Amino acid sequence: MAVTGQVKWFNNEKGFGFIEVPGENDVFVHFSAIETDGFKSLEEGQKVSFEIEEGNRGPQAKNVIKL
């Protein structure tokens, strides 16, 4: 099920960050989960749609689409 959130922060050098979801804990996002061609990056404050899966360290985003 797709969820909509807003990028809290994303570090291009390290390739990960977090997405804020209203009423939920922040969700970890790795650059490999971003659905785009070319350089995979997100901007702070950007709205995204994604799915949540349980990762090794808690919930993480997958199938991230920039809105």
Swiss-Prot record:
Coarsely, its chief localization is cytoplasm
Cellular compartments annotated? Cytoplasm
Q: Which GO terms describe its molecular function?
A: DNA binding; nucleic acid binding
- PROSITE patterns in the record, alphabetically? CSD_1, CSD_2
Q: Which residues form the CSD domain?
A: 5-64
Organism superkingdom: Bacteria
Pfam families cross-referenced by the UniProt entry? CSD
Q: Which residues form the signal peptide?
A: none
UniProt xrefs under InterPro entries: Cold_shock_CspA, Cold_shock_domain, CSD, CSD_CS, CSP_DNA-bd, NA-bd_OB-fold
GO BP terms, alphabetized: regulation of gene expression
Cellular component per GO, a single term: cytoplasm
What keyword terms does UniProt attach to this protein? Activator, Cytoplasm, DNA-binding, Transcription, Transcription regulation
What biological function has been recorded for the protein in this entry? Can bind to ATTGG and CCAAT motifs (Y-box motifs) of single-stranded oligonucleotides.
* Record note on quaternary structure: Homodimer.
- Protein name, per record: Major cold shock protein CspA
